[in-house]
Amino acid sequence: MSTADEVTKKPRRRFVGVSRGENKVSTKQVSGDEAKELVRSAKSNTGARRAINQIPDEILNDENLQEAIKLLPSNYNFEIHKTVWNIRKHNAKRVALQMPEGLLIYSLVISDILEQFCNCETVVMGDVSYGACCIDDFTARALGCDFIVHYAHSCLVPVDVTSIKILYVFVTIGIDEDHLMKTLQKNFAKGTSLAVFGTIQFNPAIHSIREKLLYSESHMLYITPPQIKPLSKGEVLGCTSQRLPKEQFAAMVYVGDGRFHLESAMIHNPDIPAFRYDPYSRKFTRETYDQHQLVEVRSSAIEKARNSQCFGLILGALGRQGNLATVANLEKKLRAAGKKVVRIILSEIFPQKLAMFDHIDAFVQVACPRLSIDWGYAFNKPLLTPYETNVMLGQDRMFNEKYYPMDYYEVNGYGRGKQPTHDNVI
C-alpha cells in the first residue's frame, strides 16, 4: 500500500488531524447474507419514477456544439447538452455561472459556448464558492440574472427555494476504476465490509465499483456507500457525514483529493479506521485525526464562553451559508439565559475582523461549523458553532472523544434551521 509522507507536527494547524502511512490494515468480515443485506440497504428503496428531461436530438446531435465541447477536458462532465437545453427551455436571457476556483479556468470557454448556442448573456461569478451552501442566487438576481448554473456541488439548497431558476452540474470526473478496485482488493481481505464515500464528483465511480466488487469471483468486497439525507448515497461534506455502526465496517474509504471532507467522517466516526484514495496521484493512505485535541480545544472554548455576558451572533452571508431560523433560535436561547446579543452579518469570518469587536466577549457563528473546529484557536475570543452553543446552554449533549456530531446539513440539522438533539446517539 502506498503511504503518505510522515507529517511533521507543528503547533496549531488548520486541522487537528495528521496523515500517517500504515503497513497493515485491520479487516472486519461479516457473513455473506449480512454483507449483501448491507449492500441491498444502500440501494434505493423507492419505486417512484424520476422525471427525465429528454434533451432534444437537435441539441444532442448538433455537430457545432460537439466541436465546441471538445475544448473542455474529456474526463470532466460539464453536462453542456443538458445546460443548453435547460437554458433554452426556460428562455433565460442572462445566466450566472458559479463554480469553485479550481474550475474557473474553464469558465470563459463554457461562457462562450452558452452564449453562442443559447442566445443569452452570461455572467461569471468570481467570488469564492466553497460548497453548495455558497450558492449565490441573491447576487445573481441582483445582477439581473434569471438563471444560475452552479458547478461541482450537490443540490444542498433545493431548487424550489432559490430566488431564480437554478441548475446544478455536478461535474463528475472519470477516474481509473480498475486501479481503485485493485487497490482495495490488495489492502483488504476477501469478504471485508467497507464504507466507501467521496465528493459528488466521484459518486458515479463509487457506485460502479460497488457492484463489480460484490460479484468479483477472485476477491469479493462488500462496499456500502453510506447516506445521510438529503445528501446522495456515498456523498460526504466537510460539515455533514453519516454516523456509521462501527461493528458493521472494517474501515471507511474516502475517494477524493485532500482531507477536508474526509475529516468530517473521521470526527463523526473516530472508532472506524479511515483511508483515502487520491484518484489523481493514485495513492492510498491511512488517515488519522486527533480527536483528543479536538475535544480539548472545543471544550476550552465552551468553558471560556460560558461566563461571557455579551455574545456576537454572526449570520454567514456567503451565498446561503447562514440560516435565519437558526440565528433566531440561538438569539432567543441566549437572551433567555440572560446574555446580551449583538447581531453581525459577515460574508467571511476572519480573526482580524472579529478582533475589532472589543466589547464582545464571545462569538457564535451560523455559517460553517468547520470555521470553529479548524480555526477556532486562531481567534482571540471563543467562536462557537450552533451545536456548541446549545451544549453551553445545557440544551444538547456534550461531546467527547467517542462522539462529536457532524450532521450540520442533515434534514433536522442546524444548517436547516432545525433544533436537533443528540441524546440518543450511540
Curated annotation (Swiss-Prot):
Q: What is its EC number?
A: 2.5.1.108
> Which UniProt keywords are present, listed alphabetically?
Cytoplasm, Iron, Iron-sulfur, Metal-binding, S-adenosyl-L-methionine, Transferase
Q: Member of which family?
A: Belongs to the DPH1/DPH2 family. DPH1 subfamily.
- Which GO molecular function annotation, any one, does this entry have? 2-(3-amino-3-carboxypropyl)histidine synthase activity
Main EC class the enzyme belongs to: transferase
Q: How is the cofactor bound?
A: Binds 1 [4Fe-4S] cluster per subunit. The cluster is coordinated with 3 cysteines and an exchangeable S-adenosyl-L-methionine.
GO CC terms on record? 2-(3-amino-3-carboxypropyl)histidine synthase complex; cytoplasm
Its taxonomic placement starts with: Eukaryota, Fungi, Dikarya, Ascomycota, Saccharomycotina
Q: What is its main location?
A: cytoplasm
Question: What is its cofactor?
Answer: [4Fe-4S] cluster
Do you know which NCBIfam families this protein is assigned to? diphth2_R
Quaternary context: Component of the 2-(3-amino-3-carboxypropyl)histidine synthase complex composed of DPH1, DPH2, DPH3 and a NADH-dependent reductase, predominantly CBR1.
Reaction(s) catalyzed by this protein?
L-histidyl-[translation elongation factor 2] + S-adenosyl-L-methionine = 2-[(3S)-amino-3-carboxypropyl]-L-histidyl-[translation elongation factor 2] + S-methyl-5'-thioadenosine + H(+)
| Binding sites annotated in the UniProt record for [4Fe-4S] cluster | C133, C239, C368
| The protein's annotated pathway | Protein modification; peptidyl-diphthamide biosynthesis
Record protein name field: 2-(3-amino-3-carboxypropyl)histidine synthase subunit 1
Per UniProt, what is one Pfam family of this protein?
Answer: Diphthamide_syn
Gene Ontology BP terms: protein histidyl modification to diphthamide
Its job = Catalyzes the first step of diphthamide biosynthesis, a post-translational modification of histidine which occurs in elongation factor 2. DPH1 and DPH2 transfer a 3-amino-3-carboxypropyl (ACP) group from S-adenosyl-L-methionine (SAM) to a histidine residue, the reaction is assisted by a reduction system comprising DPH3 and a NADH-dependent reductase, predominantly CBR1.
Locations listed in the record:
Cytoplasm
